[in-house]
Amino acid sequence: MPNCANALENIKKFVFEQNRYILPQVVDALKNNFKGYEEIKNAFWNDNNKFGNNVKEVDAIMKQLLDFSYNGGLKAKKLGDETFILTPKKDFKRIESNRTICHYEGHSMHQKYGDDFNMIFNLGCGTFGQYTLMGKNVGASADGRCSGKPVAANFSSVTGTMKNGIGNALASLKNLKLSRFPAGVAVDYCIDDTNGENCDSYFENIVREFIEENGSILTLTFANTDELKNVFQICEGVRNKFLSSEALRPYSYIAVRVGGFNAPFITIPKEQQCTYLNRITK
């Protein structure tokens, strides 16, 4: 969703408001993975109107996207109830046809199990640790992302676009009504703590602000950026067979948040390592 919100904001701004590009140009740029359209890619990527920076225009687009998702869930719930749960009183042919599509025949769930039987739709927004794999099957997008590159992790800002600090990232969540998604809407933040200057109260204040800004699910970690960059270079040496894998052993204790779970930094794929390094913020 963050990629989509950023892309729509770029199209709104550069195509319809500033008339800097025309829509066929943008479409052709995406089809060609920005080859020959580097100016468009740079304009899209470097624009500051990105979700997670407390920018009202793109936050409003995100609110619309969440509204579409929520209303779609309500419609799916209604269709599911009509098709499987409730005992039909009309539209018998349509309901029978819908059941056939799902390879189901027979009585409604209420007829089988009683009126207390229900079907729960738990809506949420998340990628877990699959954001790199998901991106491999997605073409170039109008937020400046190239084909095959990772998408945003969970509901976090697109990696590398959180420019205004964690306070503004949290403020972007305030008016999105995330509590309506019972399966959760997760954000992952990694704070640079290279110099060890952040005390416990600093992290407590982030959690308090997250709650006050109506956040849903938060994973918060801190990292020594210099140390992780050094470990990444050692991983590169191992990957390129310049170093023995034994060179990684002293760093096996360094765990990072992947998305739904923690893992040693040295064990995650290169793309996820790069994503994590670019995610670290002040």
For the regions a language model picked out, list residue spans one by one.
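Acidic, glycine-enriched catalytic cores built around paired aspartates
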Residues: M1-K282
